[in-house]
Curated annotation (Swiss-Prot):
Protein name in UniProt: Protein CLEC16A
UniProt region (Disordered), positions on chain: 375-434, 452-471, 892-983
PANTHER family referenced in this protein's UniProt entry, alphabetically: PROTEIN CLEC16A
InterPro entries xref list: CLEC16A/TT9, CLEC16A/TT9_C, CLEC16A/TT9_N
Taxonomic lineage: Eukaryota, Metazoa, Chordata, Craniata, Vertebrata
Functional description taken from the UniProt entry: Regulator of mitophagy through the upstream regulation of the RNF41/NRDP1-PRKN pathway. Mitophagy is a selective form of autophagy necessary for mitochondrial quality control. The RNF41/NRDP1-PRKN pathway regulates autophagosome-lysosome fusion during late mitophagy. May protect RNF41/NRDP1 from proteasomal degradation, RNF41/NRDP1 which regulates proteasomal degradation of PRKN. Plays a key role in beta cells functions by regulating mitophagy/autophagy and mitochondrial health.
Low complexity bias locations: 892-938
Pfam families in the cross-refs: CLEC16A_C, FPL
Amino acid sequence: MFGRSRSWVGGGHGKTSRNIHSLDHLKYLYHVLTKNTTVTEQNRNLLVETIRSITEILIWGDQNDSSVFDFFLEKNMFVFFLNILRQKSGRYVCVQLLQTLNILFENISHETSLYYLLSNNYVNSIIVHKFDFSDEEIMAYYISFLKTLSLKLNNHTVHFFYNEHTNDFALYTEAIKFFNHPESMVRIAVRTITLNVYKVSLDNQAMLHYIRDKTAVPYFSNLVWFIGSHVIELDDCVQTDEEHRNRGKLSDLVAEHLDHLHYLNDILIINCEFLNDVLTDHLLNRLFLPLYVYSLENQDKGGERPKISLPVSLYLLSQVFLIIHHAPLVNSLAEVILNGDLSEMYAKTEQDIQRSSAKPSIRCFIKPTETLERSLEMNKHKGKRRVQKRPNYKNVGEEEDEEKGPTEDAQEDAEKAKGTEGGSKGIKTSGESEEIEMVIMERSKLSELAASTSVQEQNTTDEEKSAAATCSESTQWSRPFLDMVYHALDSPDDDYHALFVLCLLYAMSHNKGMDPEKLERIQLPVPNAAEKTTYNHPLAERLIRIMNNAAQPDGKIRLATLELSCLLLKQQVLMSAGCIMKDVHLACLEGAREESVHLVRHFYKGEDIFLDMFEDEYRSMTMKPMNVEYLMMDASILLPPTGTPLTGIDFVKRLPCGDVEKTRRAIRVFFMLRSLSLQLRGEPETQLPLTREEDLIKTDDVLDLNNSDLIACTVITKDGGMVQRFLAVDIYQMSLVEPDVSRLGWGVVKFAGLLQDMQVTGVEDDSRALNITIHKPASSPHSKPFPILQATFIFSDHIRCIIAKQRLAKGRIQARRMKMQRIAALLDLPIQPTTEVLGFGLGSSTSTQHLPFRFYDQGRRGSSDPTVQRSVFASVDKVPGFAVAQCINQHSSPSLSSQSPPSASGSPSGSGSTSHCDSGGTSSSSTPSTAQSPADAPMSPELPKPHLPDQLVIVNETEADSKPSKNVARSAAVETASLSPSLVPARQPTISLLCEDTADTLSVESLTLVPPVDPHSLRSLTGMPPLSTPAAACTEPVGEEAACAEPVGTAED
């Protein structure tokens, strides 16, 4: 519609020798216009092409030759444009002329050229010309023309549009007549035009007075009625769309309401004081209070007043507080919601409202007595009969205008007489003066009320505020709206109303224009507020109740509601000095967290992809925290909560469907409540995520590969590249390395990927090749994983290919298994030790030597340190988990050649009570008394004996001897000899466990490392000679490294 026509030519009309961009050609075109002053079917195409050519020459002259505009102005060529319009020449000519004028004004850059075009008032004559606006194309080009002109407004050009002598501003008044046009693009253009006009009016008092006195009240009253009509239509759509069939229409209505609010906020941001006063008064008393706020109460009470449903009212009020930050407006609105009383409103009869509806300060949602177009024409033609109406589309309620006829004319005459008698200075009518006075009076009343309220609140203590918030019914104020807010949070069936209430509380507390005292008066959460010692107990209890309901197996609480509850609770009780929550509430919260743990246990290993869901949900929760602004833009939450994904509603905004979604929901609830519990207790998160980036091998890391199991291969990437690499498999990762030229036996990592995200397939026609694909974890459960490696690996022979495939495939299984065991530790489930290390089975007699986890110190030293000997691939059975402390025999060498390094992909964290350790290279003994934990007292001998593996037999402590047992070392050597040389496991330490004598099995707590305890509680292996002293109970080193067992206590001191 807005594109240029194909027939745009610069036209010499057959005379190709003439330069089309020249003054001479403009003179020729002027001669053409003078010969064709009357539009006919024969010459209309010629006239259109001529006008286009003139426009092109004017744009060229603006940049290159000012004499073009001198000639244009001298010959008064704009008159020809206007005469062509006035001849009723038809749709084609009107469209082409409007299009041409729009292009002309868009491309003029010099103000002098613009002055030429705007002089003589011809542009205003085109603006007020009576086009046929029933034609969509004419309407589109006309409103685009007005928008282009409004963008040219400044302190100088505005005088060409606003005439102070005739008190007329055609650009503005003609534009606002389309404020309620059915086409959304037209309405958006009108908003842009009005905003441009308001910005310029700040520096032009005469124009500001005109806008204020002649247009503000009619425009804003009609605009408010238009917005309210959309709101009622939106509410009807929600009430009749229980089956989610009209979501498209509902989304459009919500988007329209958001556009209205942003437009109103843009007007308020301009900060034109009187315009803001009039607009605030109309919004409060004609829309927000009578339609939005009063709909919160007495939903079942009938009446003639328009009313919307409770969810829609809460939803729209949340949008108001999220978007509009004008302090007088939001504070007055919040005052009514938090402390308002309906007695004054309902004491008024319908007759009183109708009789005083012309006054802006009366709170009623009522249709304006006149349409905007009629009000503007009456203001323009005071003392004259009403002029003929301009052909236009139907305004809201215009069909009733013709029915009023003589009665309305009589009312107009009476109004004119009243204005003539009571008008001051001949500018303002008495009605307008009264409206202005009402606005000022209302503002003064609000300020006096706020002042008196603040005086009453000055000496109120925190305890009194808490009591007032807890027992609102005992106060002197009746707070029906606030009571309704709390009551909506109590619904045990679902969270349909609760979600909107939480959004409203969040929006009010985060509104920049909100007075904090209003929120603190009832102890609502205020971000960045001063330190306090009390909080809103009723609200906190309701939030905790929501969390407890969410942790139930059949809970109807959506994830969005739960996350918002956690957010508001933290905002209430978490201060910079710590948590101020009472113990009873904290205990209830811990109970909800325990319920969430039990809920996840029900789904543990219930799905094959539980691990993937667990990590995806944690990633989604941390990467995409809730944005309440975006949540309130979604129309789908207006409909009752549904449990089917067929509606297309986001998972966090609906109920789960099926076991997979129930598992996802249970995991997310567990994460939220765990995170909230840790933050309120001031404890750091040490066990999540399961994989931390800082603990993984990264590209360009330099690793010690001495005695590591490496397989040479050729990597052919998808784009055809071919490189020589060595394949190495770690606990969690596979890596491609190349030798480091600076140090022998060291390698530089060129690629590292997680084993759990890897797929390995053979190549049909080549037994030496494997296709390996590693995907990057998806940002959301619904997005497709992105492959970070997709290549073919070619090995030297099929044997190495089989070994690599087996190592990768079984390494992937083992990596996933270890993470599942870490999840079990998170859920306080008993851990069953794995019988495989990287997929290779071990004898049953040695299965307990390879405990499932080992938590290493997470400090990574730089590769430039020459003392670092990182052999991350040498011992494939060193896995992260519950630590087994290692020490050195006191008879061995006083120093070791190297430390036992932490796994490069070791556990990202240990439990809160776990002590991380590495083998001390210079320590020769461990004295129990120097590191004894006060919580580790010797266990009572009356406790039942535990059930231990065969090789861990309890003997009397006094029979221990300082000589090491060589039988144990010999047994370990025999067991490892059956493995491939590259898979020889590192020597495991002798295990000493502090346990209860009556325990039947090992518990998770018994495998958690704590400092040493009393020597009488140490247990040693069968067959070892008696030790002379408890401190000397160490085994003989089997290889270069030796390990000494530290006792293991419980995790819970």
